[in-house]
Structure formats: C-alpha cells, structure tokens
Amino acid sequence: MFAPLLKKLFGSKNERDVKRMAKAVQAINALEPQMVALSDEQLKAKTAEFQQRYAKGETLDQLLPEAFAVVREAGKRVMGMRHFDVQLIGGMTLHDGKIAEMRTGEGKTLVGTLPVYLNALSGKGVHVVTVNDYLARRDANWMRPLYEFLGLSVGVVTPFQPPEDKRAAYAADITYGTNNEFGFDYLRDNMAFSLDDKFQRELNFAVVDEVDSILIDEARTPLIISGQAEDSSELYIKINKLIPRLKRQVEEVEGKPSEEGHYSIDEKTRQVELNEQGHQFIEDLLSQNGLLGEGESLYSAHNLSLLTHVYAALRAHTLFHRNVEYIVQGDQILLIDEHTGRTMPGRRLSEGLHQAIEAKEGLPIQAESQTLASTTFQNYFRLYNKLAGMTGTADTEAFEFRQIYGLDVVVIPTHRPIARKDFNDLVYLTQEEKYAAIITDIKQCQALGRPILVGTASIESSEYVSKLLQQAGIEHKVLNAKYHEKEAEIIAQAGAPGSVTIATNMAGRGTDILLGGNWEVEVAALENPTEEQIAQIKAEWQKRHQQVIEAGGLHVIASERHESRRIDNQLRGRAGRQGDPGSSRFYLSLEDNLMRIFASDRVKNFMKALGMQSGEAIEHRMVTNAIEKAQRKVEGRNFDIRKQLLEFDDVANEQRKVIYHMRNTLLSAEDVGETIKEFREETLNATINQHIPPQSLPEQWDVEGLEAALYSDFAVRLPIQQWLDEDDKLYEETLRSKILEQIVAAYYEKEELAGAEALRAFEKQMLLRVLDDLWKDHLSTMDHLRHGIHLRGYAQKNPKQEYKRESFTLFQELLDSIKRDTIRVLSHVQVRREDPAEEEARLRREAEELAKRMQFQHAEAPSMEQAVAGEDEELPEGPAPVVPLEPVRNEQKIGRNEPCPCGSGKKYKHCHGQLD
C-alpha cells in the first residue's frame, strides 16, 4: 500500500544505487586533470604503486577512484576511447559483485576494463567469461594493448589448446575464455594425476559477459565429461525402424484425448508418454523382432534399458526436428542453441537421445558415453569469491539472479536517450498472412533506404523467409547456424542502406550493427590501403550513415515471439544503439508455437468477436499483454526447471566438494602413508565386525568366514581358529590387535621389497585411481537414482527427500568403498622396484590417452517436472521413461503377494513389485 509512496519519496533501489555511485564518479572526474598531466611512464608506474599499497593493507574499494581514473586515461592514450560517466557507474556495479544492465551499443566491453584492472591488482587473477571462442579472442585482442600498457598480462583459454599454453593463460593477470571452457577445465583439474597437470588457480573474480545467456539460458544443462561405454548401435537401429509404426494420440475439440493412438506429447514440457495401448503395441513389436522375450514386460527390471531406448527413439522422432533443434553436417548431428541459433559442435544429448537421432537420420551411431565428471554452471560460478556480469537485458530475470546467485541487477542509464520506436505486435490468423505482411513491410522500408533485420526463431523459418524474398526479387543475406562462418561479414554490412538481413536469434552475436555499414571491415578487405583510400572509405561511410539516420535507422522485424521476453528485448535492442533512430515490430500468427501452446484460445476468441477477415491483423495492447502473460508463464516454468535442477545438483555438489577436496589434499600430499594406515584399520574393523559382532559371544563368531574375508581384503591367510584353540586368553579386542599386527607385518615385507619411497608414490597413485573409478561409478548410480526417483511418489513419498536420503546412503557407501578397495588393491598387488617418476609418467600417459577419448557435453537438461510430481502436481499415469536405481532398503522387504504400499489395491508383484 505504501510502496508507491515510498518509491516516489526516496526513489527505487536502482535509482538510489545509481545516485550513490554518481558521487564516486565526481571523485574520479576530479582526478582526471592529474592523470592527464602524467607521462606514459608515470601512468604505467601507477600499477606497481597500487599493488604495493594493496599489499600494505589498502582495500580495492579505497583504490577504486584512482584506479578507474588511470584506466580511463590509459584508454584515451592507447585506444582513443574515453570512458563515459555512465560507463564508470557500470564499472563500479561490476566491482561490487552485481549485474550491470547496459543497452546495446553502450560499450560493455570497455566498461569491463575498469573492474578487471582493479581486481587484477590483487594478483589473484580475473576471469572474463564470454559466450563463444570468437568473442573471447576478439575481446582479449581488442583490450590487450590497454592492459599491457598498464603492465598486466592477458591470456585466452580455448578448446584443444596445448597444456603449456593453457597453463600460461591461467597464470596471466587477466584470462579470457568461454563459460564452457572454464567449466570443463575445472572438471579436468579434478581428474589430474599431479599438481603440475592442473590449470586453474583460485577462482577469485569473474566478469560474465552476456550474463543472462550463460547463467540462465544455459543453466538448465549440465556440463559433462564422459568416456565411451558399451556399444549398442544395433539396438538403436532396430528400435528406430519400429517407432514410425506408432501413432500420436490427438486431442479432440473438447480437449480430451481420443482413444486412437499410442502416445501423447506435452509440448509445454517437451515430454512424450506412451499410453496403455502404446505400451502393449510396442511390446508386441519388440517381441516379434526378437528384442523382448515372449510374455515379458517392458517394465521388468532386466528390460528397463530397452524401455530407455524406446523412449529415446520416440523423443527423437517426435520432439527433435531437422533444421530446428539440429542440423546434419556430413555424418554428424550438430545441435542448435535455441537461444542464439548457433551450432554447438562437440555437444551431445544424453540418455541415448543423440544416438537415437543418429539412427533416425541414418548416420553412423557413435558409442554411448559414461559420465566421468559433471557440474552445472550454477554450482561452478558460485565457487568464485566474487561474481559479476553485464548484459543488455537482465531486469526481467532479476528475481532469479538474486535467488540463485545472490546477484543484484542495476540498470545503468544510457549515455544518450533511446530514440527507438517499439510498435505494438500485429497478430494474424495464419502464418501465410503473417509472412505476406512481413514481405510488404520489408519492401516499404527498403524503398525508404532503411536497413532491415528480420529475426526468426529457427533455421526453418529463416529459410522460408529467404525463399519468399527470392520470389519477390529482394536481395538479402541469411545468418543462421548453417552459415555462421560468414557471420562477421554479414553483420558488418547489416546496417547499409536498404540491406535486408535474416538472422536466427540475434541473441549472443556480440557484434553491433553500425548504421551505414562498417567502414573498418571495408578497409581490412584492402591490401595495404593508403591514407587516401581510408579517408575516401570513411567519407563514403559518413554519407551512408547520415542517409540511414534520415531514413529512420534500422528497422527490426521479428517473425514470432520467443519463449523469453528477454530474447525479444535483445532483438529489439539491435536498433536504436547510442541514441540512433530505429524501430521494431513483431509479426505473429495464431499458428506460431508460443501462441498455439500458451495463448491461442483467449486471443482467438477475441479475434472472432471482432469479426476478423483473412489478411486482417489485430494491433491491440490487450493482445500484446496476453502474449507477454504467456511468455511469463513459460519463463516461470523454465525457472522452476532450473531451480529443481539446482536443488538436485546441490545434493551432488556437496558430495563433489568432498571428493574434490579429498583429491586435492592427496595431490598436494607428499606422503599418504598415514591415510593408508587409517584406511587399513577402518577396513579391518569393518571386516571383523561383520563376522565377529562387537560384544558378542564366541558362539556367535563366524571364524571361517572371517579367515576367508581377511584373505579377500588383505591377501593374508591367518589361522584364527588355531589361535583361539591354542590361547584361551584371546578375546575380541586382543584378537583384533593380533590380526592387525599380522596384516601390518605382511605389508612391511612388501615395503622392504619395493622400497619405502616407491611404495609411498604407488600408494598415492593407486588411491587416486580407485577414487576416480568409484566416483565415476557413483555419478552413474546418482544419474539412475535421479531419473527414477519420481516413482517414489506412487508410494506417497516426497521424491526430493527420498533423493537426499538415498544419495547420502550411497555417498557413505562410496567413502567406505574407497577405503576398502584401496586397501584390497594395495594388499594384493605384486610389487617390484620401479622409479616413482617413471610410474607417475606412465599414469600421466594413460590419463592423456583417456583425455583423447573424452567427450565434452553440455547435455540436454534432464526434465525435473516429474521428479517433483509427488509434491505439487498430480502424478503421471504409468511409470516414466527412465531407468530407476533399485532402491536401498531401510525398511522391511514387502512380500510379493502382499498389498502394494502405494494404495492401488493391487498385489505388490503386479504393481511396483515389477520394478524390483
């Protein structure tokens, strides 16, 4: 009630933040005459002075006004660019560990130099994170002269970089790279066999460019390093042939599903589900083709992997379309980033989905993979001591940034007022009418000499618009995932008078469209251009630039609304940069995906009430509001998916931290002898407790079993029964001590034979190997657990709580297994003298061989809607298409003929007992 009044009196939080920083800007401006008076050498010397002052106890906040003034002056001298006051505010926002929302063309790259320089003074390193390798290299090369003038080193990390180059890049004061490469290097570091093989230092400060794209759009999908698993390509091919025989269950007019069909598709959640008829039909087909035993159920425990293959193939055929979600290049499937329209070479979908698409397209099927290490961007970026980001559009996602990352969004004022006109959406009944209107708009703008940018949501749409323009005889350029090697050339001239550029999702392109075209690209195309040629090109560009401004600037046409308002705003933001004129218009139809799935009924009824005819459009704020409401619905759903992914990964993340800490401790330890000693005693006590329970009577002891277990775990044959027969004074505790003495003595014999130094090195390497192997298996088990955990909802249990409980049990078992397996390997190994350095070199060679076979995936996010179905939503009918882990039983086993605890009334063997 009082919020509007308080806001009027005191301003919004954003206004107060900007006002507070404006005072600091005055202090920086006051230092400018002092900096101008310094010679180049004196200005360079400021860096060493700041570093000394920091070492003596001054904080970075105290150094900020002078440091920013130094960077501003260096920018003028080295690059001919002076930071505006609003850019100083942006720099302070980033230094404070916040997100700066700055409009397109406001110079985000230059803004980044301010906090990057300041934080690099600490000597702990700064990471500048971009969305692709091209931008990482471009920005690093662009800003390198400025940083090097000030005495700071700059490095760039890229995929397939030689290890020594990558190590040098991370050792630099400032390191540029992509979010994927930083994330994968973190995972690779935690698979290293030596401290010398690690790349990254402490994760100190990261500035994330296009922060919304990296921390939100890509947060649904985990980073995975995987190795090859068993080959099942024949199975994919056989099942692929059966899927086209299944029919989709369509909805009738009333919204109820018809009885015809085998499966239904939920387009909102991108899930596909076999119905009862479909289950029976596919089981019959599998039986006829010899893939399923006669009378067997697809849901029997030993057939669950077959079920996974069926659902993977079904999703490949129904949810993934060529030239929309992926393209075929040679004999490979290249995924398309839905947010940027770029292809993602090297990325593969998980859970057999990529192989299913390869089978669908008749391509060679690459072997499935097994997860070796994984994390999410959410958990990786939260490892940094301080995180900041910048983007043109963050305010719509401010709540998520705050809740997930603890980052506030500050909207930075523009240097010049925005002069762009954003027209209301035009909504047509059909796509055909919509595209006809788009062509008409293009012709009108071209006649005026205005450049036009047409934004589409898929390659298919971009190629359709291109076809229509060809038929209309309009010259144009196409920028989509198929042709992005020509990207820079196309973008450079997208602002030329009358030019028409079709772009698939301009988000994340990272290049401004300059009105009149880009004269620097024209100069670069010449061989050894003279001063006269450069001056002539500049003059011609100035004439074109003025011509485009007078015509009304760049006109942005969008062929449909994206799921996210933010992506729409990014497309709009391509026009009207730095106060230039421009305009934008969205053309929609009731047949568009977003309208059809989320907003069609209400808008359709409204349009019918108006008595709209074919070819007519509606332009009304109510329609635009209805569409934005639909977008907010989608954004909310996507936020829930990301939040649920994080909640599940948080459980794994705590375990990941423990394992990685254990691993780093081992790597930095010169001697793990004490650790091995502890493992030996704990393993021995566990083995003895299993056969001689604490405080038990001798009659309860399983001596024969203990003798066998000791040989299995410690490779020693001990006559325990003989000891007990010969010595009446032996009881539980003294027996433990005697067994330990014998085991230690046997191990010391091994040490004398191999040499203490060699055995210590071997212990360390073997412990690392056991830890890695078991962690890899644990990740696979956790995957299966997560994918099947929603089934617990049938038994009225909370899937999230069940996941936490069972994953904790699994982790305890993992820690016990690491101890037991390490001792077992060390006890059984036959030792011979070998140089520790040779052993380490051999292990490193093996690790390099493994690295060659690794795959780096930013895999499709596993769906989490079903995982929380037990909490908020109605459970789906029938089990989901995933492989559940067999539950760890802490409760009493249920008899097969007893009633099922889920409350269905069926016998357990006919209900959930089929999964046991």
Swiss-Prot record:
Alphabetized SMART domains for the sequence:
SecA_DEAD, SecA_PP_bind
* Catalytic activities: ATP + H2O + cellular proteinSide 1 = ADP + phosphate + cellular proteinSide 2
Q: Which gene encodes it?
A: secA
GO BP of this protein: intracellular protein transmembrane transport; protein import; protein targeting; protein transport by the Sec complex
Keywords, A to Z, come to:
ATP-binding, Cell inner membrane, Cell membrane, Cytoplasm, Membrane, Metal-binding, Nucleotide-binding, Protein transport, Translocase, Translocation, Transport, Zinc
Q: Which domain of life is it from?
A: Bacteria
Kindly list the GO molecular function terms attached to this UniProt entry. Answer: ATP binding; metal ion binding; protein-exporting ATPase activity
List locations, semicolon-separated: Cell inner membrane; Cytoplasm
Q: How is the cofactor bound?
A: May bind 1 zinc ion per subunit.
Q: Which organism is it from?
A: Pseudomonas paraeruginosa (strain DSM 24068 / PA7) (Pseudomonas aeruginosa (strain PA7))
**Can you supply one Gene Ontology CC term for this chain's record?**
cytosol
The ranges of region (Disordered) come to 857-916
This chain's function reads: Part of the Sec protein translocase complex. Interacts with the SecYEG preprotein conducting channel. Has a central role in coupling the hydrolysis of ATP to the transfer of proteins into and across the cell membrane, serving both as a receptor for the preprotein-SecB complex and as an ATP-driven molecular motor driving the stepwise translocation of polypeptide chains across the membrane.
Q: Which Gene3D superfamilies match?
A: Helical scaffold and wing domains of SecA, P-loop containing nucleotide triphosphate hydrolases, SecA, preprotein cross-linking domain
Residues forming coiled coils:
none
Q: Which family does it belong to?
A: Belongs to the SecA family.
Write the protein's name: Protein translocase subunit SecA
Q: Does the keyword ATP-binding apply?
A: yes
**Residue ranges, compositional bias (Basic residues):** 906-916
Q: Which cofactor does it need?
A: Zn(2+)
